[in-house]
A protein has these predicted regions:
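Single conserved hydrophobic/aromatic residue that forms the stacking wall/gate
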Residues: 1-7, 12
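Alpha-helical transmembrane segments
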Residues: 81-90, 224-241, 321-332
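Membrane-interface alpha-helices at helix entry/exit sites of multi-pass transporters
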Residues: 112-126, 197, 359-376
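Helical hairpin unit composed of two closely spaced alpha helices linked by a short loop
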Residues: 271, 275-383, 387
Length: 452
């Protein structure tokens, strides 16, 4: 059986996947955990009228609250125990990474290996709980004044005000804490990045509903068929663009000087240093979405006029939303790349192994050259991320297309999917298997590339 990823020249051959018991167990474990996540997304928070809440959200089509509900797989619209999703955890991770740059103590922890990373993880967990408490309290307070379009109250709890708020805060915070633990379990015992896969699963389950809803709108003459065709073509183009950009590399040639060790000659080989065009992956849009989701999940449940006016300006496709999103994408693209790559360290390792870039002096000049190339690639990658995430939403608003599954969601789905494929491929190759992708020039080049 062979499954091909469109535009990537990679064909999955699944006969090798289940030959390795450990990989098979990891895949089954990941699927089981994601199934639990989907079950939890249907367990309601006590004291909520589901019918009234559904009617309220149906009236919020196109709002930022509706947009971020997509990342929770509909849990926010149903206000289930997983309504907050993993966004508080992502926000806490962003804060910790920023604080690592600011505070020397945290910077030292990040360089202490596994022990230091464990401490930072503990601090991130604490931060997640704090942010969850704040968001959950804001939602619980806003729910009390919410009503469906027909006037039916959303809250039907017989408890007093603070009793309902306390129960809601505990429920939503516990749900986020459980998802945080689930993500860590996937990292340790499953395959892929746990948090990314949870977001991936939340988006994917909404795809069939979005397609069916779009077809119904065409049948009822609410949108023209040509618009649906344009949306379909645009989605295909975005998928091709994401696959191309996420697999594209810039190769910096590296030459190794000849040297004698004993009676043998070493070196004299040519290789290259591969740098991804988009080295930050899908992290910038996920981080940007998380930051915008934090106030949105609170203001969306508050019916005060001026709060709703601000929330309306943060709708996908609006100028303020697009501007903030682009700024954050550029910031996190450069920030995350700076964390992942250290040009000085790369230059030192290259020099220590007798390698040099033709025409560039080893050491400081090499570090400056690599940093310059990396900066240009990151800038181009940030433009690509911003275009993929923002342009479809702007077009949907301009043509009045009620389709919330935009470029950001497609980018995350395709990016996380490619990352999962690469991790399984690496696992198979590490076990001396042929892998489950056909050999391509890209893979052959990667095998011959410089490893630092």
């Amino acid at each position: 059986i062979r499954i091909c990823l469109v535009g990537s020249e990679m064909c999955i051959r699944d006969r090798n996947i289940f030959r390795i018991e450990e990989l098979r167990q990891r895949i089954y474990f990941t699927l089981a955990i994601l199934f639990v996540f989907r079950l939890g997304a249907h367990i309601p928070t006590p004291g909520i009228d589901g019918v009234a809440l559904t009617a309220f959200f149906e009236a919020q089509q196109g709002s930022i609250l509706r947009f971020f509900d997509m990342f929770t797989g509909g849990a926010l619209a149903r206000l289930t125990v997983f309504a907050l999703g993993v966004m508080p955890y992502i926000s806490a991770s962003i804060i910790m990474q920023l604080l690592t740059v600011v505070f020397p103590y945290l910077e030292r922890l990040s360089k202490e290996g596994e022990a230091g990373r464990k401490k930072i993880t503990i601090y991130t967990r604490y931060g997640t709980i704090v942010l969850s408490l704040v968001q959950a309290f804001g939602i619980s307070a806003g729910l009390e004044s919410m009503a469906a379009p027909d006037g039916s109250p959303v809250v039907i709890s017989t408890m007093n005000t603070w009793g309902f708020r306390g129960l809601t805060v505990i429920t939503l915070t516990a749900g986020t804490a459980f998802l945080m633990w689930v993500g860590e379990q996937i990292n340790e015992r499953g395959i892929g990045n746990g948090i990314s896969l949870i977001i991936f699963a939340g988006i994917v389950v909404d795809i069939p509903g979005a397609i069916i809803n779009s077809i119904r709108l065409v049948q009822t003459d609410q949108i023209q068929p040509i618009l649906l065709i344009i949306v379909g073509v645009l989605m295909v183009l975005v998928i091709f663009a994401v696959i191309f950009m996420e697999t594209a590399y810039r190769k910096i040639p590296v030459q190794y000087a000849k040297r004698m060790q004993g009676n043998r000659m070493y070196g004299g080989q040519s290789s290259h240093l591969p740098l991804k065009i988009n080295s930050s992956g899908v992290i910038p849009p996920i981080f940007a979405s998380s930051i915008l989701a934090f106030p949105a999940t609170i203001t969306g449940f508050i019916t005060i006029p001026w709060v709703q006016a601000v929330s309306a300006q943060l709708m996908p496709g609006r100028l303020l939303y697009s501007l903030l999103f682009v700024i954050m994408i550029f910031f996190f693209a450069f920030f995350y790349t700076a964390i992942q790559f250290n040009p000085v360290k790369i230059a030192e390792e290259m020099k220590r192994h007798g390698g040099y870039i033709p025409g560039i002096r080893p050491g400081k000049k090499t570090a400056e050259y690599v940093n310059g190339v990396l900066s240009r690639l990151t800038f181009g990658g940030a433009i690509y991320l911003a275009a993929v995430c923002i342009l479809p939403s702007i077009l949907f608003v301009a043509f009045n297309v009620p389709f919330s599954f935009g470029g950001t969601a497609l980018l995350i789905v395709v990016g996380v999917g490619l990352d999962l494929v690469n991790q399984i491929e690496a696992f198979l190759l590490n076990q001396n298997y042929d892998g489950f992708m056909r050999k391509t020039k890209r893979r052959q080049a990667r095998a011959a590339s410089l490893k630092l």
